[in-house]
Amino acid sequence: MKKSNGAALIPIYVFLVLYLGLGILFEYVLKIPMGFYNIPIVVAFMVAIFVACLQNRKVSFDEKLQIMANGLTDKNIITMLLIFLTAGIFVGVVGRSSAESVAYFMLSIIPARFSVAVLFVVACFVSTAMGTSVGTITLLTPIGVAVADASGFNLPLCVASIMGGAMFGDNLSFISDTTIAACNGQGCAMKDKFRANFWIAFPAAIVTLIVILVKSFNTEIGGVVQHDYNMIQIIPYVLVLIGGIAGVNVFVVLIVGIVSGSIIMLATGQTAAVDLLTNMGSGAAGMFETSMVAVLVAAMCSLIREYGGFEALLSAIKKVFKGDKGGQLGIGLLVGAMDIATANNTVAIVMANPIAKEMADDYGISPKRSASLLDTFSCIFQGIIPYGAQMLVAISAVSELGREISAFQIIPNLFYPILLLVSSLVWMLIRSKDKTHLAKRR
């Protein structure tokens, strides 16, 4: 075991000061729209890596390069990168029209009284199928505004219901970058993490649905939204969802989705062959920054681990959190703190992964449980911070339609993230240790 060295964590502090500090300056002082997302996160990590390279003069620069390279040779890192790109290609192939068909189909078969509840359920389904909360919010917020205008429901409630459903799907989806990052970082199968997550997320979703229905029955309603949809375009999402739940290899699931989506888009005339290839490239390109962040974090964390930074952090956490339940809470708060600082749940998970892995080993927490904790708590914090991408995208989408709404109007209606936190803490208290994992450790 390496000697504990708190100074080895300085690169993380440098990144947080750059990213969080400049984000606050841009967003709240200079009033730049979506200020946090004008900060080039790759540049911030490059500066942090440069600082890490300046530390520990006993290790030569060539040796530091080798240490960083060793961090990238992990099978989980390579798997994560390939899944990121494949998932991006899938989303590029099926496009927005397929997801719109999913949304409008579900809205068409439900009475107007339940339209806000349907928005929540649709967001859950679409986000689980698409693997992106931001994409789901971008897609469904205009529909939510239309529902509010046509039915008389409260606009913040409609938007918050979409955001809550989007975070549910982002947390559970097999092709979500948070799921990919958590599972590969902790070394567990996606189906195992899904099962662990499901029993935490599902009760929270059910209670959220009940709360929305209660509020809906206390509202005077008008008409209902009607729009054309294409049932055939729903097929790729359904196949991906079924394959993922059944535990089929994620690459097989995504390839089936890509092939079926390509055939359907070409057969229905939704896209030309040349455009289909372009869309594949655009979808993959959409994952480039996330992939590069994963690479840079792996390199930076390799140096921090070599310098003894993880030992220092683990030692500090162990002084506060005791036993299995304390370890679980420690992992949850660790990724939560990273998310508050970065306003990006995927980056938060990638940064927390190596530390959480060592914590899980020390506290006897199974990989599927630690992956579930990382994904769930990052989802909770990301779902309620007023400067997160999900909140900013929702507000921007509403503004583009000529309506005004603020984060502080939406937050009181964000029932799902709060109930997910309650469900997580309750599950943490009542569940027993994973006996299978403990037996393997012995």
Task: Name the predicted role of every residue range.
Residues 57-60, 73-75, 152-156, 181-194, ...:
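Juxtamembrane helix-boundary/capping and inter-helix hinge elements in multi-pass membrane proteins
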Residues 80-91, 111-143, 318-357, 362-363, ...:
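Hydrophobic alpha-helical transmembrane segments of multi-pass integral membrane proteins
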